[in-house]
Amino acid sequence: MKIRKMKKFVYLFVCLLCVSIADAKVTVPRLFQSGMVMQRGKPIPVWGKADAGETVTVSFNKKTYSVVAGADGRWRVDLPVMKAGGPYTLEVKGEGANSEGIVLDDVLVGDVWLLSGQSNIDVTIERVYPQYTKEIDGLDNPRIRLFRVQNDTDTHGVRDDIKPTSINWKPLNKQNAWLFSAVGTFLGKRMFEKTHVPQGIIVNSWGGTPIEAWLPADSLRKDYPQLLKRLSIYQNDAYVKAQGQANGLAAQQWQQMLDESDPGINGQWAATDFDDTAWTSVSQWDNGWALSPTTGRPVVGTVWLRQHIHVDKAHAGKPARLLLGTLFDQDITYLNGCEVGHTYYQYPPRRYDIPEGLLREGDNVITVRFISKYGKPHFLPEKPYMLAFGDDRMSLNPMPQDVIQLGEQWKMHLGTEMPSCPGTDISLQNQPTTLYNAVLHPLAPYALNGVVWYQGESNSGNPAPYADYLRKLMGSWRTLWNDQQLPFVIVQLANYDGRQQNGSPSPITLQTTPVNSNWACLQEAQHRVAQADPRAELAVINDLGETVDIHPLRKKEVAERVALGFERLIYNNKVKLSPEVIASEVGEGKIILTLDQPIQAGELYGFEIAGDDGKYHNAAASSDGSRINVQCSMFNVQSLRYAWKDNPLRANVRSLTGLPMSVFEIKVKK
């Protein structure tokens, strides 16, 4: 009886084992999909998982390669170096008749670029469309492919694969690029124009994230143990889940209470015939309208603003675009009582389409319901505030011709006041190692041609360790890819002055006296690291920023400067990048700077010198085109710096091709 039971058990075990083998699948990472681009000129790793000991065959370009999966089920085949070309088919298959194969079609071989960092990499083609309308309308190149890594985090350790994504090796056209990185799109376009080979653009970024999130634990363990100690709090999954749920519920209840307590909703303050004569008249540039009458501090809650505009018969009924600059931090906007748009966070430009028939001859009313979650509701200066008509109404470069400018005067009434809104999550993406673990590590060893790193805004509050972090990032990523020659182009922070953002009146005020600038400190750290690394270049964009907008629109020019860096690093083109100081000496009453290239001659601004006390003073400077002479009457000058401001609008050292010189600080040699 016992023998019979044992035989039955063995039989069931064998059957289950057979089913397991029959159901087993060979897998490849989600980065491997039809339409992918693989790197020319290097061995091409193809890898994945299978049953331990299973033979996996990879077929590509009329050749077949075999490998046996290890004890952990991992397998890898390195395809030989290939020239650019395609399309090809990549097939991956396990052993056995029942093994399901993987067939990937339309595979190209060309150049693959990884772009990583924070929100300025994220800025989409949709956002910059008004800056480059004609060029974006013409986007169409099936040999440029776009891949967007889905955001994810992991506090415990590295992952083998990424999450599914909606932009997975899509061919470049306006529709596919609309929600894709503008820098990535323009970089692919530029590099294709230079090389005429397929381009693969992998974007792996997350807005607002610090560099520490992109570093592996091993790189932090020795020098920054406090960061890993901080991470340990978030390794408690039960805490993270409970806190996230509590925060989400609190934010949801806050929004519900806000709406229920706002008299403007039930009172229909957006209605065209609503009587606003008793409301207070305010200028959008006078921040007094945003102050609470009870606390005297910026309002948390809602503020309603109404502006009456006159529309003549020629424009009545026509479709238009309402440009409301940028508002902090949320808004719901109405025209003649109809909602025409809303934006639920502070950064996007407000561009709302007005349908045909909504504008009427005579008086029209624009109503804005400001929602301020954290205090400081305001308009951003130096942005367009207008109604635009005509076929060019989508464009800001050049500006549309047929417009009705909005006035700066509004009627204002306080809606409701609230306590500050609780956060909706605990932002695991801002914790050390979490992005390296979840979205960077799984990409290796996918063969790359180069990396673009565009980040730093979130580290500007504490720039001191940034240079070390950046060196560790480049070193650890090169180790991960087993390629110590992997090229990096670091995009330096653009000029930006957050002090001006909080509703200052236009025009922007210039910083003219020497200041301590964390922004410049971080820019200088980026400059210093790039200078010291023979496989890195710096894209200087200190002339492409916007004083009050941390997300400037000129992303095509950013991509072009990144491309110049790669031309020098990879293709050995002797292109000139931004001017660099290669020597300095103290002459009679001046400091003489020798540069690596000629520059535009004339009077120069942005230089400061300091003596023994370390206090900086403005210094006049000029150039004859080959050297810079900085005037110095100081007896014991010790150091010199350039463009040391958040927004150094007057700094004007440029190459003959117009590229700006980087922020720098040097000790003066006597």
Q: Which residues fall in each region the model found?
A:
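Aromatic-lined ligand-binding clefts that engage carbohydrates, nucleic acids, or primary amines
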Residues: 47, 279, 309-337, 366-368
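C-terminal beta-sandwich/jelly-roll accessory domains of carbohydrate-active enzymes
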Residues: 64, 592, 596-670
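Catalytic cores of secreted or luminal carbohydrate-active enzymes
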Residues: 245-284, 522-585, 600-602
